Amino acid sequence: MAVICNTCGLPEDLCACGELAKDSTKIIIRLETRRFKKKGTMIEGLDPKLNNLETVAKELKSKYACGGTAKEGYIFLQGDHRDTIKDTLTDLGFAEESIELH
């Protein structure tokens, strides 16, 4: 017997609740200066309940060959990656309209 989603009532293989919630989140990308004037890219607005932040951070760190961390609701990457991060997040399945660059 198929498992039924509690939110939409559809079988789990047809459920699109996670994708709809992923499209409705507002992601903010900005440059942040940390200790010793080191710059880093801050990605905020990711819901840790819907997205596995460690997995997304691992994908981004391997793509940009940089260090970084995933904490409560944000991902911090070492270095300035604002010019290409929007395309990368779109490739990972986030809606382009929900990504805001500061």
Curated annotation (Swiss-Prot):
CDD domains: YciH_like (cd11567). InterPro entries: DENR/SUI1_TIF (IPR050318), SUI1 (IPR001950), SUI1_arc (IPR022851), SUI1_arc_bac (IPR005872), SUI1_dom_sf (IPR036877). PROSITE patterns: SUI1. GO terms for biological process: formation of translation preinitiation complex; regulation of translation; translation reinitiation. The keyword Cell inner membrane does not apply. It holds the Pfam family SUI1. GO terms for molecular function: translation initiation factor activity. Keywords: Protein biosynthesis, Translation regulation. It comes from the Archaea. Belongs to the SUI1 family. This is Protein translation factor SUI1 homolog.
